Amino acid sequence: MSSTGVLKGAVAVVTGGASGMGLATVRRFVAEGASVVVADLNVEAGERVAAELEHAVRFERCDVSVEADVAAAVRAAVDSFGQLNIMFNNAGMGGAFGPITEIESDDWDTTFAVLVRGVFNGTKHAARQMIEQGAGGSIINTASVAGLGGGGGPQAYSAAKAAVINLTETTANELAAHSIRVNAICPGIIFTPLMHRGDEADAETVMSELQPLPKRGEGSDIAGAALWLAGPDAAFVTGTSIVVDGGISSAGTRLYGRLGGTQNLDRVVGIAHGTTGQAASVRRL
């Protein structure tokens, strides 16, 4: 893919940037001229990314549910590269999974701590820095098609992603006066390391059966959306959620009918989150 240098001179923090959609976005941002702080729990993977991309990337160990860690990642961007222009709140987890009667309260709370508080922490500290700089900026949050409406998805994950969409809209309204744009990306079934924990062949079958578009969702598809939201072509875009799902959400109720009911829907969700055949348990990306 050719580069246009659309992010030349920009500085970004990407949480969950050591794998999956985050890593694809880090590589795309760097290819377009940005410097990036990769904020991730996985030290080995994060250091590997920093070594691969050398001077353009700094790794910072970060648990997004811990505010001090996120604040440190923002400081790392300023200390290493002089500013912060883009914040991609992408770190996530499959979350508490299983029947509502079986989910443990602690697992529910952990899911929200990572998926919602993590976005809050990132938005808060990125906005503080961007306001201080006085030059605007772009904050991008990873939500999900599961957060767009009720359905048969995992309760904790779906509810948390709905909260991310709402948080995106409210903070976009608040921060617009500072020329800070806040948007969300709603992926569908994206083939990431999390999915590798499930049945890869089954995942391929599920995606080909359910998506109107006959292609596998890849991290690069999310990276493309993030690049657009981060760059000047989206200068008039804020408070919106971009759906990148191969058409799954447009299938509406037809999707549920094609799945054949709750049992198969649970199977699909299990594949997508690498939790097939397991009890309600928290699994981090």
Indicate where each model-derived feature is located.
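Canonical Rossmann dinucleotide-binding motif of NAD(H)/NADP(H)-dependent dehydrogenases/reductases
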Residues: T4-V37
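The beta1-alpha1 cofactor-binding region of Rossmann-like NAD(H)/NADP(H)-dependent oxidoreductases
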Residues: V43-E44, C62-A72, S105, S220
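Substrate-binding pocket helix/loop in short-chain dehydrogenase/reductase
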Residues: G98-I100, E104-F112, M207
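Active-site helix of classical SDR
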Residues: T123, A160, T168
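Alpha-helical segment proximal to the catalytic Tyr-Lys
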Residues: R128, N173-A177, A235
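Residue(s) in the substrate-gating loop at a strand-loop-helix junction
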Residues: S144
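C-terminal helical subdomain
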Residues: A184, D202-V237, I242-G246, H273-L285
